[in-house]
Swiss-Prot record:
Domain G-patch: 310-356
Gene Ontology molecular function: any one: DNA-binding transcription repressor activity, RNA polymerase II-specific
UniProt-recorded name of the protein: Zinc finger CCCH-type with G patch domain-containing protein
Source organism of this protein record: Drosophila pseudoobscura pseudoobscura
Record region (Disordered): 254-277, 407-430
Compartments reported by the entry: Nucleus
Function text: Transcription repressor.
Superkingdom: Eukaryota
CC terms in the record's Gene Ontology section: nucleus
Record key words, sorted: DNA-binding, Metal-binding, Nucleus, Repressor, Transcription, Transcription regulation, Zinc, Zinc-finger
Zinc finger residue extent: C3H1-type: 155-178
Bias (Basic and acidic residues): 411-420
Length: 509
C-alpha cells in the first residue's frame, strides 16, 4: 500500500515537470491506474479486517462455551470423586474395624533405619487419612507387638490399664504403633515342631523382651527347651524355657523356599534365561582366569604349600570363594602370587644394623625369613633323628640278648660277644666327648628306670606269693629285667672307661 502511494506521488511530480504531450498522456494513464489500484486495495483490506473481527468473535464465544462445559464437567467429576473417596474410606474403615482384636504381622522401623515384621495385635483404627505408596487413600492401624524385641516395642502396662501419666511421645514404652493398613500381613503362628538343635528362636526373658537364641535340645514330652542366648550380656546364657515362651524363627532360606512353593512366578522362562546368562558369564570368567594363569609367573613354591602339615582349611575356603590355583589374588586374578613371607629381625638391633647384616649377606632378601629359619631347624632335627635312629639300631634289646645267649653256641657266642664288645668300643671311639656325656646321662637315666621296674616286680612277687602261675611269669620278667640292667651297666662301664681313657690322653698330651 505504501509502495503504491509512493509511486503515485512520483508520477504526479513527473507530470508537473514534463512538457512533452505524449509522456504526459502516458503518465496520466499510469496515475489513473495507480489510483484505481489503491482504491481496490483499500476496499480489500477493509473486507479482510471485518472478516477477521468476525472470526475472533466466533472463536471467543466458542472458547467461553468450552470453558463453561469443562467447569461443569470438573464439578461433576469432583462431586463424583468425593463421593467415591468417601465411600472408599467408609469401606476401608468398616474393613479395618472388623479386624480390631485380630492378630497380624506388622512392620516396625527401628531407630537405626532397618525395618522388620513382627507379630502384633490390632487394637484400633486411626482417624487420620493418609496416601500410601501407590497414591491411594489409606488409614493407619494402631497395633501392639506380641513378641517385642526392643524397649520401644514393649507395650506400656499403665497405658493398657488407662493409668499412664505420659503421652505417646514422652512415654518410653509403646502406646501402640501406627502402621499403614496396606502394609500388614497375615499372622505367623509359632511352629513348635520345628524346635530342634540349632533352630533360631525368640525367647521371652523376665524383662518381657524376647531375645534371640538357638535351641540346644528340645523335650517334646515336657514341652521344654534348653536355649543358648546370643550376646554376652546374659549371666546365664543357657536356660530352660517352656514352649509358650519361645517363638521359632524362619530363616531367609526357608522363607525364600516357602515363597517359591506358595506362589508360582509368571516369569519363570525369563528367570531361566537370566540364570543361563549368569552361568555363561561365570563360565567365561572362569575360562579367562584359567587363561590368565597360564601367563602368570610360576613361583618355585606353591601358594599354601605349608598346608601339607594341616587340614588345608584355608585353601578350601579360597576355592569356595572362587579362587583358581595358579592365578593371583583378587576378583580379576591380578594380585600377588607368592605369599608375603614373615621375617624375624634380631632382637635389640636397630633397622640400620639389620640392613648392614643383610648387606653383609650379599643383599639376601630372605636373610631374616622365618621359613628359612624353620627349614634350617628342620634339617638339624632330621640329622639328629638320623643319628638317634642309628644309635637305636645298634643298641642290644632284650630279645636280641636272649636270642644271642640262649640260641647261640658257647664258643661262637663267646666269640660273638668279644666281636660285639670290640665293635662297640670302636664305635665309642668315633663319638665326640659331648656325645659321650649325653649318652652317659641317658644310660644313667635308663639304669635308674630299670631299677625302679625291678623293685616293682619284686613288690608284685611279695603280694602274689600264693599264685604259682603269676609267680612264674613274674620270675621270668624279673630275670629279663636284671639282664637288661646288666647290659645297661656294662654299657655305662664302657662309656666311663672311654671317658677316662680320653682324660688320661689329655693329661699325657
Amino acid at each position: 500500500m505504501d509502495e503504491y502511494e509512493a509511486q503515485l506521488v512520483a508520477v504526479e511530480q513527473a507530470l508537473e515537470n514534463t512538457t512533452d504531450e505524449q509522456q504526459r498522456e502516458e503518465l496520466s494513464t499510469l496515475r489513473t491506474n495507480l489510483q484505481e489500484l489503491l482504491a481496490l486495495t483499500r476496499e480489500t483490506e477493509a473486507d479482510q479486517t471485518a472478516q477477521q473481527g468476525d472470526i475472533l468473535d466466533d472463536e471467543l464465544l466458542r472458547l467461553k462455551s468450552e470453558l463453561n462445559e469443562l467447569e461443569e464437567a470438573a464439578a461433576n467429576v469432583g462431586a463424583t470423586k468425593n463421593k467415591d473417596e468417601e465411600q472408599q474410606l467408609k469401606d476401608l474403615r468398616a474393613k479395618y474395624n472388623a479386624l480390631v482384636g485380630e492378630k497380624c504381622s506388622a512392620p516396625h522401623e527401628h531407630s537405626w533405619g532397618a525395618s522388620s515384621y513382627h507379630n502384633a495385635l490390632i487394637c484400633g483404627v486411626d482417624d487420620e487419612v493418609i496416601i500410601n505408596r501407590n497414591s491411594e487413600l489409606d488409614v493407619r492401624l494402631r497395633v501392639l507387638y506380641i513378641n517385642p524385641t526392643h524397649c520401644e516395642m514393649l507395650p506400656c502396662n499403665y497405658y493398657l490399664e488407662g493409668e499412664c501419666r505420659f503421652d505417646e511421645i514422652r512415654c518410653r514404652y509403646s502406646h501402640g504403633a501406627l502402621v499403614p493398613g496396606a502394609s500388614i500381613k497375615s499372622y505367623i503362628p509359632p511352629d513348635f515342631p520345628r524346635l530342634a538343635r540349632n533352630c533360631p528362636v525368640l525367647a521371652k526373658m523376665p524383662d518381657r523382651l524376647w531375645h534371640r537364641g538357638r535351641v540346644l535340645c528340645a523335650n517334646f514330652v515336657e514341652q521344654t527347651c534348653r536355649v543358648r542366648l546370643d550376646g554376652q550380656d546374659h549371666k546365664e546364657r543357657e536356660r530352660d524355657f517352656q514352649f509358650e515362651e519361645l517363638f521359632p524363627l524362619i530363616t531367609e532360606k526357608e522363607d525364600e523356599l516357602t515363597s517359591e512353593d506358595s506362589s508360582s512366578s509368571p516369569h519363570d522362562e525369563s528367570s531361566d534365561e537370566i540364570d543361563s546368562d549368569m552361568d555363561d558369564l561365570e563360565a567365561a570368567h572362569r575360562s579367562r582366569m584359567v587363561e590368565l594363569s597360564l601367563f602368570t609367573f610360576k613361583p618355585t613354591e606353591k601358594l599354601g604349600a605349608w598346608e601339607q602339615y594341616t587340614r588345608g582349611i584355608g585353601s578350601k575356603l579360597m576355592e569356595k570363594m572362587g579362587y583358581i590355583h595358579g592365578t593371583g589374588l583378587g576378583s580379576e586374578g591380578r594380585g600377588i602370587v607368592t605369599p608375603v613371607s614373615a621375617q624375624i629381625l634380631p632382637q635389640g638391633r636397630s633397622l640400620d644394623a639389620c640392613m648392614e647384616l643383610r648387606e653383609a649377606a650379599n643383599g639376601d632378601q630372605d636373610y631374616f625369613s622365618v621359613e628359612r629359619k624353620l627349614k634350617r631347624e628342620q634339617r638339624r632335627q632330621n640329622k639328629a633323628n638320623e643319628k638317634a635312629y642309628a644309635r637305636e639300631t645298634q643298641r642290644t634289646d632284650v630279645f636280641s640278648f636272649l636270642n644271642g645267649s640262649v640260641l647261640g653256641g658257647g664258643e661262637s657266642r663267646h666269640q660273638g660277644d668279644q666281636a660285639a664288645k670290640k665293635a662297640k668300643t670302636n664305635d665309642l671311639q668315633q663319638h665326640s666327648t659331648k656325645t659321650l656325656n649325653v649318652e652317659t646321662v641317658r644310660v644313667a637315666d635308663d639304669i635308674r628306670r630299670k631299677q625302679r621296674d625291678i623293685a616293682k616286680v619284686k613288690q608284685s612277687l611279695d603280694r602274689n606269693a600264693t599264685d604259682i602261675q603269676l609267680q612264674k611269669r613274674l620270675h621270668m620278667q624279673l630275670q629279663s629285667q636284671k639282664q637288661e640292667l646288666a647290659t645297661l651297666q656294662a654299657h655305662e662301664h664302657r662309656l666311663s672307661k672311654e671317658q677316662h681313657t680320653r682324660k688320661n690322653k689329655m693329661f699325657e698330651f
